[in-house]
């Protein structure tokens, strides 16, 4: 299948300057980015197509080769005039072969992409479970609004480096071998700024604290990262910006412990409710619900409230809330209450029914068997 024309992909004229090309690419990248169009193969393909077109047309040498030879001039799998891929001489060929050994092949030096940034965001459990929008402030480097990222004073432009002719690299030949290194004149940039911008001092970028609104999806957990494409540091001299990664950390909750999509909590139960049964109020993230406690409930028994956990960020399935019963021993008893408990104990012990204390009776019977085995 034949490739589309790069200028047609970006929707610009063949005479478009760097700024117009960059603006067109940004518009398409925002429109078709995979993060904005999940599970949409067509958008992903258009995003890749626009990215490829921008990578060629934003590079002066590659653009010149494309304008002259079309796709064959920039596709390494297609040979250009002379059979060496775009009319390369033997110096180019040997430089590509041996240059990797001595510091990189002879390639066009592109302006560096902006650095990625990380922002640590702390959320409450409720925010993580339900989702939330947060406004954050991020100190970063942004494109200079006076020179529009060129680094040159308004009305002027950067000049092609006379030493490396815009490649950003020079070759030092030692017999058969060619060693490639960064151009010492332009420091690998390929361009010289003779009249730098007064605001950014030739860097093309300035320090600024950006205010961003971040939408946190429901179901995130500690360790999850949210990528904001193009919100990192601005690239050098019009190169693409880096990305911003929001690192999520969920604070400890006073009641609930999260494990995956399930929540866990302990519910205190009076010893009378545990013995006779009843209902207790149980907290959930959606409000309180009443839980029926069966008779003879012991500490450690788990009760599952289905669908009261966390909705999965990926599958949408709802987790459960698991409640562990903790039978409370009454404290600060009056003399009358203590006497009543003693009467109850005497009644239980004198009934001859072992099932009144199943765990205690089982424990002491096990201890007796253990010592009988030792002495027998």
Swiss-Prot record:
Q: Where are the zinc fingers (CR-type)?
A: 131-209
Write out the annotated subcellular location. Cytoplasm
The record's section on InterPro entries has: DnaJ, DnaJ_C, DnaJ_domain, DnaJ_domain_CS, HSP40/DnaJ_pept-bd, HSP_DnaJ_Cys-rich_dom, HSP_DnaJ_Cys-rich_dom_sf, J_dom_sf
Kindly state what the record says about how the cofactor is bound. Answer: Binds 2 Zn(2+) ions per monomer.
A GO CC term attached to the entry? cytoplasm
Q: What is its main location?
A: cytoplasm
Positions of the J domain: 5-70
Q: Name one GO molecular function term.
A: heat shock protein binding
The UniProt record gives the binding positions of Zn(2+) 1 as 144, 147, 197, 200
Names of required cofactors: Zn(2+)
Q: Which CDD domains match?
A: DnaJ, DnaJ_C, DnaJ_zf
CXXCXGXG motif repeat ranges are: 144-151, 161-168, 183-190, 197-204
Which purpose does this protein serve, as stated in its record?
Answer: Participates actively in the response to hyperosmotic and heat shock by preventing the aggregation of stress-denatured proteins and by disaggregating proteins, also in an autonomous, DnaK-independent fashion. Unfolded proteins bind initially to DnaJ; upon interaction with the DnaJ-bound protein, DnaK hydrolyzes its bound ATP, resulting in the formation of a stable complex. GrpE releases ADP from DnaK; ATP binding to DnaK triggers the release of the substrate protein, thus completing the reaction cycle.
* Subunit annotation: Homodimer.
**What's the protein called, per UniProt?**
Chaperone protein DnaJ
Its lineage reads:
Bacteria, Pseudomonadati, Pseudomonadota, Gammaproteobacteria, Aeromonadales
């Amino acid at each position: 299948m034949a490739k589309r024309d790069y200028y047609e992909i970006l929707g610009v004229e063949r005479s478009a300057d760097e700024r117009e090309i960059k603006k067109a690419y940004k518009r398409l990248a925002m429109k078709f980015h995979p993060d904005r169009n999940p599970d949409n193969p067509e958008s992903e393909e258009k995003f890749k197509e626009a990215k490829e077109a921008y990578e060629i047309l934003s590079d002066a040498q590659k653009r010149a080769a494309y304008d002259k030879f079309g796709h064959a001039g920039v596709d390494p799998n297609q040979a250009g005039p002379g059979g060496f891929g775009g009319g390369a001489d033997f110096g180019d060929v040997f430089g590509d072969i041996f240059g990797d050994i001595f510091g990189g092949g002879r390639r066009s030096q592109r302006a560096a992409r902006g650095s990625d940034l990380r922002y640590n965001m702390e959320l409450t459990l409720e925010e993580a479970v339900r989702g939330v929008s947060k406004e954050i402030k991020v100190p970063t480097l942004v494109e200079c609004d006076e020179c529009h990222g060129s680094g040159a004073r308004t009305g002027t432009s950067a000049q092609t480096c006379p030493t490396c002719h815009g490649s950003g690299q020079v070759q030092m030949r030692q017999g058969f071998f060619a060693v490639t290194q960064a151009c010492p004149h332009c420091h690998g940039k390929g361009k010289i700024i003779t009249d730098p911008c007064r605001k950014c001092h030739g860097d093309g970028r300035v320090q600024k604290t950006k205010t961003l609104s971040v939408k946190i999806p429901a179901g995130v957990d500690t360790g999850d990262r949210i990528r904001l494409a193009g919100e990192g540091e601005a690239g050098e001299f019009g190169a693409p910006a880096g990305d911003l990664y929001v690192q999520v950390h969920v604070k400890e909750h006073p009641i609930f412990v999260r494990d995956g999509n399930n929540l866990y909590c302990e519910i205190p139960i009076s010893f009378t409710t545990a013995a006779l049964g009843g209902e207790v109020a149980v907290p959930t993230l959606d409000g309180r619900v009443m839980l029926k406690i069966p008779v003879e409930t012991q500490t450690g028994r788990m009760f599952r409230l289905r669908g009261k956990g966390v909705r999965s960020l990926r599958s949408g399935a709802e987790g459960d809330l698991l409640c562990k019963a903790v039978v409370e021993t009454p404290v600060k008893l009056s003399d009358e209450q203590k006497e009543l408990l003693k009467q109850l104990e005497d009644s239980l012990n004198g009934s001859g029914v072992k099932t009144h204390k199943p765990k205690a009776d089982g424990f002491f019977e096990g201890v007796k068997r253990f010592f009988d085995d030792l002495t027998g």
